[in-house]
Amino acid sequence: MNEELVDRIVREVREALALKAGGGEGLHNGNAIPLGVSNRHIHLTRGTFEKLFGAGAAFEEMRSLYQPGEFASKHTLTIIGPKQRPISGVRILGPLRNYDQVEITLTDAITLGINPPVVNSGTLDDAAPLTLVGPAGSVYLPKCAIIASRHIHMTSGDAARFGVQEGDYCKIRVGGIKSTLFENVLVRINDNWLLQAHLDTDDANAANIRSETHVEFIGKM
């Protein structure tokens, strides 16, 4: 069995398990997308990681995440904004990247006293400043904090099925007692990804999302 076929089977099995775990109340399976809820987290470069944890420090994996090759590390930091009200225990996700980024919610931003933009991950031109504190030192990053846009990870095959392209915006619906329609959900396409929608904890709490579930794809904006 070739590697490409194995990858496809693994992708389909994981998506099916996520769909089963999420139930199916009021949704049509053909339009169902597994949902992941993103808590605040950090992406770092190797250089910044070593400033915070020490020269030559090992970047250690704790557990795998849903998307292939991505993982939660064993390492956490404290983040501090102008209000000097720190948020501790913010986990670093791997692998290490070529830019430093802190993804937070609006609730976090109010606590920290900053006004980060709502943008796609990696868009840092207007990002807000924060100080990161680790066991070996601290680093001030003038442009690092964002609120990540609602988005869906898709393969090109998924995109064709839903009739969307990279960079399109769409609508998704969450069922349940606090059924919610989310608009301005960004489409991101990469054939190495598994199909999954991402909301942050503010959005998830507003819709009373308590566990793994799935959303219904409604259509393009």
Where are these regions (language model features)?
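Protein-protein interaction and targeting regions used for scaffolding, dimerization, and localization
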Residues: 1-31
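Short beta-strand-centered segments at strand-helix junctions
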Residues: 34-82, 88-135, 140-167, 171-175, ...
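Electrostatic, structured charged patches in enzyme active sites and in nucleic-acid/phosphate-binding
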Residues: 221
